[in-house]
Design a protein with these regions (language model features):
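Surface-exposed, charge/polar-rich loops and edge strands
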Residues: 2-39, 43-171
């Protein structure tokens, strides 16, 4: 059965408990459900294969079970593994201490970004399909970088570290 990852925007241990989130997806009929880290990453199996349909089903399950709404971006584990194998950062020299991040877009509308783009300690490097690959060196200005991503791509996005993507693929 195909395996998927739901990346939820805005989830933290303060606003969503992972056992409750897991239960919501199981109640909706998803199988082999696992949460990864406490920031809204859920891995699951589903016969349904259209990611947009899975996004709506996950969001409906969370609203029904928790009374909360979180934007959800779903990708197949196979797709994420290919993305990891591609290593979109390999063509760039990264500063020491750089954090690699992936911004998952909910839709594939055209975006006019002049890349690579650098601001303070952050660089937007490459847009491949629906994903934006960036790096930043953690600093007090890091939240400004997240605001720049939102300004460039809109609010229908969620961002994860490269390490988190590796963890969900292995889950």
């Amino acid at each position: 059965m195909p395996r998927y990852v739901a990346f939820l925007r805005g989830v933290s241990p303060m606003n969503c408990k992972m056992p409750d989130l897991k239960r919501c997806l199981e109640d909706a009929g998803f199988t082999n459900v696992k949460t990864v880290i406490a920031s809204g990453n859920v891995v699951f199996d589903s016969r349904k294969t259209a990611e947009s349909s899975l996004e709506r089903k996950v969001e409906a399950a969370i609203k029904k079970g928790l009374g909360r709404e979180f934007l959800t971006c779903v990708r197949s584990v196979d797709y994420l593994q290919k993305m990891l194998d591609m290593n979109p950062y390999s063509d760039f020299k990264l500063k020491v201490g750089s954090k690699r991040v992936v911004t998952f877009r909910r839709d594939n509308t055209s975006v006019d970004l002049k890349l690579p783009f650098e601001l303070d300690n952050a660089r937007m490097l490459r847009l491949v399909g629906q994903e934006l690959f960036s790096v930043y060196v953690p600093s007090p200005k890091s939240p400004a970088f997240m605001q720049l991503i939102e300004k460039s791509l809109g609010k229908n996005v969620t961002t994860r570290t490269w390490e988190t993507v590796q963890k969900v693929v292995r889950a």
